[in-house]
């Protein structure tokens, strides 16, 4: 599985925080997919899907925010390595009458993975949806943010047992609205 199972690698022997030294790791293709959702009133989701929000195109703005966030993760998470990102895909799809599902896939060729970048992309996408729609629905709930799948590196492939990962995910930019 992983050389560090059960060990907090961001702490040294004295318990002080440190950035993990990845210089001895191989440079490999790494990919991570995360997901989450925003729960809202059906009228809010309808407004988003029909493009009638007062602040503009919620889907396009949230997608761009998520992509930008993935690229800035190393600045936001203190011990996260700054990485060159090869690709970021963010999708937003309505599910039912009151749920906007978000997925982000991040790809790099590096010595460390992009799980945090994918999780950050989903989180900032959801926050942007909330920001753009809060005037009409302050009760929106950001929920279920999680890592669904990752590949590459020493720890190999991980797929969450209940992940709903589409085989073609990673390249699609079509949204269900």
Curated annotation (Swiss-Prot):
Ligand binding (substrate)? 79-81, 116-117
Look up the EC number in the record and give it.
4.6.1.17
Output the GO biological process annotations, alphabetical, semicolon-separated: Mo-molybdopterin cofactor biosynthetic process
Q: In which pathway does it act?
A: Cofactor biosynthesis; molybdopterin biosynthesis
Q: Where do transmembrane segments lie in this chain? A: none
Write down the NCBIfam families for this protein, in alphabetical order.
moaC, PRK09364.1
Q: So what does this one do?
A: Catalyzes the conversion of (8S)-3',8-cyclo-7,8-dihydroguanosine 5'-triphosphate to cyclic pyranopterin monophosphate (cPMP).
Tell me the protein's name: Cyclic pyranopterin monophosphate synthase 3
> What is the originating organism of this protein?
Mycobacterium bovis (strain ATCC BAA-935 / AF2122/97)
Question: Which lineage do the record's taxonomy fields give for this organism?
Answer: Bacteria, Bacillati, Actinomycetota, Actinomycetes, Mycobacteriales
Q: What gene name does this entry carry?
A: moaC3
